[in-house]
């Protein structure tokens, strides 16, 4: 879970072997969030958005882990070994939500 402010998180669910179960999504977390998955067994949450969700998802197991260069290097090596390369000429970042421009209501001068 990545903190997206308020009670919203960017999240994706994985099984115990690290295989994705869902697509990446933005979720507003409440007591009913992920109920189908939580009913199936231990539900582990971690990331910058997990701590703020721990009280609402009281049956979830909160694990304190942080991303590391070592973990990223392992993923990069696996992709490299498998020939999984991005075509940088056509690469576009993945933005989960559209950017919305707003004007400030505060007067600077």
What are these regions (language model features)?
Residues 63-109:
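Acyltransferase
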């Amino acid at each position: 879970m990545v903190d997206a402010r308020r009670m919203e998180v960017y999240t994706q669910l994985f099984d115990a072997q690290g295989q994705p179960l869902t697509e990446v999504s933005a979720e507003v977390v409440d007591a009913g969030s992920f109920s189908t998955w939580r009913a199936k067994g231990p539900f582990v949450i971690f990331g910058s958005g997990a701590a703020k969700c721990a009280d609402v998802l009281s049956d979830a197991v909160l694990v304190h882990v942080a991303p590391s260069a070592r973990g990223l290097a392992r993923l990069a090596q696996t992709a490299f070994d498998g020939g999984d390369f991005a075509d940088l000429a056509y690469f576009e970042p993945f933005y989960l939500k559209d950017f919305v421009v707003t004007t400030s209501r505060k007067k600077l001068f």
